[in-house]
Amino acid sequence: MSSSFHHQPVLPQQVLEALAELPDEGVLLDATVGGGGHSSLLLDVHPGWQLIGLDQDPAARAAAAQQLERFGERVQLVASNFAAYTPDQPVVAVLADLGVSSHQLDVPERGFSFRADGPLDMRMNTEGDGETAAALIDRLEENALADLLFHYGEERLSRRIARRLKTEGPWDDGERGTAALAYAIAGCYPPKQRHGRIHAATRSFQALRIAVNDELGVLETLLNDAPNWLEPGGRIAVISFHSLEDRLVKNRFKADERLRVISRKPLIASEQEAEANPRARSAKLRVAERLSAELEPAQ
């Protein structure tokens, strides 16, 4: 499983620089360890650091175990969503890469991509009993589905798409998958808009993935809890990939009295990285530093 997990870390130099001046010894909590790319870079340049790596995706944990094997007992991998975890000791840094990995997109069985047919799943945690995308579409009323597509995907044709999906359902019957869903969504667009640079189904697939995994809800939990995990002077670094996440991170960092924002504007990929790794084009890194340990969470 791990051998098929390919995940090139985005903004590697920016992450290293953001966490460069932290203490020589401490614990790094990688809230989305993925394939272990960011963590391996940080453990290399901080030989006194230990790692707690979280991921609810079993394929990601297997890949991380292989990537980080050379660090031995410095590494602890935990099967957990970061919203359900609390470290038992202060940490010097918290890192979260909120993007879907290349592996998750490239494996049709995961149901994240419309570029190859697969089941309408979209769950990050395939070992759990959470609701699939197909079940979610079937369960929601048309208006609720339209609201979901609009708010989570910023899809301007959300009403039209929701009406078509409910008309053509049920989707949780094992007969149709991601290709059929993408075809139905694209059919709601005028012919000239169906084959642009951004696929017509992109926003709807994003919205369904966010809803299935409660991505904004668990991010809210992380942003509320993580400052309490940090040592004074420790840093939290969050990489987001769409405006909903970035806006949430920006506003919470700014409003949280426990934190000092390190950079007013997000750090983004260089032209060279964006060309070499298209996934990095939409990546934004925001960093904040922990102030006094006595302050309570922002409400």
Swiss-Prot record:
Native source organism of the sequence: Synechococcus sp. (strain RCC307)
Catalytic activity: cytidine(1402) in 16S rRNA + S-adenosyl-L-methionine = N(4)-methylcytidine(1402) in 16S rRNA + S-adenosyl-L-homocysteine + H(+)
GO molecular-function terms, A-Z: rRNA (cytosine-N4-)-methyltransferase activity
Membrane-spanning intervals of the chain: none
GO cellular component: cytoplasm
Signal peptide range: none
GO annotation terms (biological process): rRNA base methylation
Record-given protein name: Ribosomal RNA small subunit methyltransferase H
EC number: 2.1.1.199
Summary of the function given for this chain in its UniProt record: Specifically methylates the N4 position of cytidine in position 1402 (C1402) of 16S rRNA.
Record keywords, A-Z: Cytoplasm, Methyltransferase, rRNA processing, S-adenosyl-L-methionine, Transferase
Places the protein is found: Cytoplasm
Gene that produces this protein: rsmH
Binding locations of S-adenosyl-L-methionine: G36, G37, H38, D55, F82, D97, Q104
